[in-house]
């Protein structure tokens, strides 16, 4: 019985020591963590923004066919549900291939 009491006291002390909440994590040393709208994108140069837009356009133009099929299927709810069971290729074939005349 004494060992059980001693064990429970040690467990309570361990829980109290491990669950101590420090208020330091709640404090912020910054006066204002937000920046205004003018300075929000000032850390990215205009050339980097242009390069990112150009790369995005290239990625959009060079998408593989299965990705284009998947995007078309995602916009149509029935096709998306069918794809969850049978896969995107089967769903695209069922809902879109017949409309375009391909077999």
Swiss-Prot record:
What protein is this chain from? Answer: Matrix Gla protein
Query: Subcellular location, in the record's words?
Result: Secreted
- Give the Gla domain ranges: 51-97
Output the Gene Ontology cellular-component terms: extracellular matrix; extracellular region
Cross-referenced PROSITE patterns: GLA_1 (PS00011), GLA_2 (PS50998)
- Please give the superkingdom of this protein's source: Eukaryota
This chain's function reads: Associates with the organic matrix of bone and cartilage. Thought to act as an inhibitor of bone formation.
Phosphoprotein found in the keyword field: yes
SUPFAM superfamilies found in the cross-reference section: GLA-domain
């Amino acid at each position: 019985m004494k060992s059980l009491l001693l064990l429970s006291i040690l467990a309570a002390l361990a829980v109290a020591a491990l669950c101590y909440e420090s208020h330091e994590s709640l404090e912020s040393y910054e006066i204002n963590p937000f920046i205004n709208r003018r300075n929000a994108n000032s850390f990215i140069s205009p050339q980097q923004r242009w390069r990112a837009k150009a790369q995005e356009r290239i990625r959009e133009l060079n998408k593989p066919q299965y990705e284009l099929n998947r995007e078309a299927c995602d916009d149509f709810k029935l096709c998306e549900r069918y794809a969850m069971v049978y896969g995107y290729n089967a769903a695209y074939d069922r809902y879109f291939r017949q409309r375009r005349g391909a077999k």
